[in-house]
Amino acid sequence: MRAASFVRCVVAVCVIVMQASVSGAQSLDVYRGVNETQLGWKTPEEREKIIDNMRQAGVGSVRVDLREPFDKYIDSLDLLTRKGLSILMIVQFAEPQLVARDATRRPGRGSIWSVVPLSQLDPEFFREKFGGLWREIERRGIRLAAIEAGNEINWAAFNGDLGLLPPQGQPPQGAPGSVALHDRAAYLLGLRRYVAAVAILKQFRDASVNNRDAKIISAGLTWMPATFAAYVGAEYVDSNETLDILKADGLDAVVDGYGVHFYPGVNQTLSQRNRDFEDLLRPCAVGGRGHSCWLTEWGVRQPNLACPSDESKRVPLIRETVDRIAANVRQKRIGGSYYYDWDDNPIEFTVWRCGGLTEAGKVLFGR
């Protein structure tokens, strides 16, 4: 997402129409979701048009940031609520505004942005700054289906505790699924402080007038081959390893689900895609026991930008992934699913192209 957008163009590293029953008050909207994380940077007219197009396409839920410019992003949340779309709101920890009064960024390189280390996170500063934003969200009557605490905190693009390495390297010996970690102590400290901040989110949610039923989802963790992370020169920690650390720090007591990301590749074999997906969902609940996973990003690349969009390779893989997700929804292993992306960069993944909904988008949203 954004800082990691170049990865989407290379790596095979979000909601859909699901013909599956969903228990309790959980709406089917969160199975017909899509990412549109840049709404706060659009003009009011652009936001209105984008959201109207989404509604007409059959989108049920939108994953959108809460970050600078905060007033514009809250305006976007307000408009989504008034237009009847459900919301998965991401609370970002990669930028200083919610992290600490004196937070500093780790330098970036190229498309890997300069971001704040999670180890700098001051939970009480977060309580103060997020609390003001939350009160405005409540005052406006904005309704949230879920709150995602952070994004891709297990690699260098979104967590400054993870460093940049010489590109085109190789994963170090003895670290399957991960790359480097020159300062593991800082990474572990950052994850502990992250869990403390999520506990504060839960306190606000539990005291809410409008959003007491909103689910709290842990940061969507990226899944990528360690060889690719080494190639681009970025420290990366395996998603399951990171989740195990977070759970040991008390994550399960403060979240309702685990965020995960998945980008299946057209050039992979079916057995490879099945194996990767099962590995991704290893921590997810089976039969409603434990926490389900929320697929807060998944997407399929279509790199030919000519109009009309050539969907011949993408549509079969999207159908395959929709079926795979639906099977896991029925088992209650997946609690929500959001396609990446509606119409923003990287455009190779978007489903709104050439002025309309692509064939891939029609498959996703049942049109």
Predicted segments with their positions:
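N-terminal secretory signal peptides that target proteins for export/translocation
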Residues: 1-6
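Bacterial N-terminal signal peptides
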Residues: 8-19
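Boundary/entry segment of secreted carbohydrate-active catalytic domains
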Residues: 25-65, 340
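Hydrophobic faces of well-ordered beta-strands that scaffold small-molecule active sites
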Residues: 32-36, 62-64, 87-91, 145-149, ...
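Short, acidic/polar
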Residues: 39-54, 126-136, 232-249, 318-325
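Aromatic-rich peripheral "rim/lid" segments of glycoside hydrolase catalytic domains that contact
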Residues: 42-45, 164-179, 303-320, 324-367
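Substrate-binding cleft and catalytic face of glycoside hydrolase catalytic domains
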Residues: 50, 54-224, 301-303
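Noncatalytic carbohydrate-binding groove/subsite architecture in carbohydrate-active enzymes
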Residues: 90, 182-315, 347-359, 366
